[in-house]
C-alpha cells in the first residue's frame, strides 16, 4: 500500500490542477463572452438611436432641413472661403455649410445629420477614454448624453450643422493632443533610461512644461478650427487632471488651462466680435421640443419654392 501512495498523491495533484485549469479557461471564456455581450448591447443601442434619429428627421421633420439648405450659402470661390477666417471655428463652419448644401436631396439631410451626431458621440467616447476615466459604461454614457442633447438642439431650425462638427472637433483635438503628449513622455522616459544615474530631464521638469505647453497650444488651435468646441477640449482636460490630481504637475496644467481660456479674450481684436461670440461661435444651441407647427409652415413655404403648387393647396386646405 505504501508503494502506491505517491502515485495517488500525484494523481490527486494533477486532478486538482486540471480542475483549476478548466476553471480558469471557463472564467476567461465567461469574461470574453460577457465583454462581447456588453459591446453588442452598446452597438444595438447606438443603432436603434441612429435609426430613430434618421426616421424622425426624414419623415417627421424634413422641412426644417430644407429650410436650412435654402438659407445657407456656400460658394466654391477663394474670396468667399476666406470669409470663414473672420470668425472662430472656420473649419467646422466651412465643413458644416458645405454638407448643408446636400440637404436638398432626398434622404441626404437626415443621413448627414445622423452621421455627424454619431461622429460627435464617437469622438466624445474616445476622448473620455483618453481622459483616464475608469469604467466600461461611462464613455458610452457620456457619448449617449451628448448625442441626445445634439438631437434636441437640432429641433431648432436655426441650429447649424457646424455646431455639431465643432463638438466633434473639440473632442478630436483632445484625442490627438493626448496621443502626442503620451508619445512624447514615453520618448523622454526612454532617453532617461539610457542614463539612469542622471535623470536630468525630470529634474528640469520637462514633462510638466511640455504638458502645459501642449494645453496652451491646443486651446488656441482648437478655438481657431472649431470655435466653441474648445469648451469640450477644456472640460476633458479638466476632468482628466482631476482624475490624476495627485500626480506631479497637475496644478500647473490646470493653471495653464484657466489662463489660456482667459487669453482667448484677446481674439476680440482679431475677429472684431464681442466676447460672447468668441466663446460661443458657431452657436451652442438651446433645448427645444419638436416644433411641429412650424414644420407645417415650413412645409408650405418649401413646397411653394419647389413649385409644387397643388401640394401647397392641399396642405392649406387640410389645415383649415
PLM feature segments, named:
Residues 272-320:
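Soluble catalytic regions of membrane-associated enzymes that act on cell-envelope
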Residues 39, 114-132, 148, 171-179:
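Transmembrane-helix motifs of polytopic, lipid-linked glycan transferases
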Residues 28-53, 252-258:
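Start-transfer (signal-anchor) and selected internal transmembrane alpha helices
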Residues 36, 132-133, 185-206, 238-239:
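Membrane-interfacial, low-structure loops and terminal tails that flank and connect transmembrane helices
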Residues 67-70, 85, 89, 113, ...:
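Membrane-interface micro-motifs in multi-pass membrane enzymes
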Residues 56-115, 296:
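Membrane-interface coil-to-helix junctions
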Residues 42-55, 139-148, 211-217:
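Alpha-helical transmembrane segments
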Amino acid at each position: 500500500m505504501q508503494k502506491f501512495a505517491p502515485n495517488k498523491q500525484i494523481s490527486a495533484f494533477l486532478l486538482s490542477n486540471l480542475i483549476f485549469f478548466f476553471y480558469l479557461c471557463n472564467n476567461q471564456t465567461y469574461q470574453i463572452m460577457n465583454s462581447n455581450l456588453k459591446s453588442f448591447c452598446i452597438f444595438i443601442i447606438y443603432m436603434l438611436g441612429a435609426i430613430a434619429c434618421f426616421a424622425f428627421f426624414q419623415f417627421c421633420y424634413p422641412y426644417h432641413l430644407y429650410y436650412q439648405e435654402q438659407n445657407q450659402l456656400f460658394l466654391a470661390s477663394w474670396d468667399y472661403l476666406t470669409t470663414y477666417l473672420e470668425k472662430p471655428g472656420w473649419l467646422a463652419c466651412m465643413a458644416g455649410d458645405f454638407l448643408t448644401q446636400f440637404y436638398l436631396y432626398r434622404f441626404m439631410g437626415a443621413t448627414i445629420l445622423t452621421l455627424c451626431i454619431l461622429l460627435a458621440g464617437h469622438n466624445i467616447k474616445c476622448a473620455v477614454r483618453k481622459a483616464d476615466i475608469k469604467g466600461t459604461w461611462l464613455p458610452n454614457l457620456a457619448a449617449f448624453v451628448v448625442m441626445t442633447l445634439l438631437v434636441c438642439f437640432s429641433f431648432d431650425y436655426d441650429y447649424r450643422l457646424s455646431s455639431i462638427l465643432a463638438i466633434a472637433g473639440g473632442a478630436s483635438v483632445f484625442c490627438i493632443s493626448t496621443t502626442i503628449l503620451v508619445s512624447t513622455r514615453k520618448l523622454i522616459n526612454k532617453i532617461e533610461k539610457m542614463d539612469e544615474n542622471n535623470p536630468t530631464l525630470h529634474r528640469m521638469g520637462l514633462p510638466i512644461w511640455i504638458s502645459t505647453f501642449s494645453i496652451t497650444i491646443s486651446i488656441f488651435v482648437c478655438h481657431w478650427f472649431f470655435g466653441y468646441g474648445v469648451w469640450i477640449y477644456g472640460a476633458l482636460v479638466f476632468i482628466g487632471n482631476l482624475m490624476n490630481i495627485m500626480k506631479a504637475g497637475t496644478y500647473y496644467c490646470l493653471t495653464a488651462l484657466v489662463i489660456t481660456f482667459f487669453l482667448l479674450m484677446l481674439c476680440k481684436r482679431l475677429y472684431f466680435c464681442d466676447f460672447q461670440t468668441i466663446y460661443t461661435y458657431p452657436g451652442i444651441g438651446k433645448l427645444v421640443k419638436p416644433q411641429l407647427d412650424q414644420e407645417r409652415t415650413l412645409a408650405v413655404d418649401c413646397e411653394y419654392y419647389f413649385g409644387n403648387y397643388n401640394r401647397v393647396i392641399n396642405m392649406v386646405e387640410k389645415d383649415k
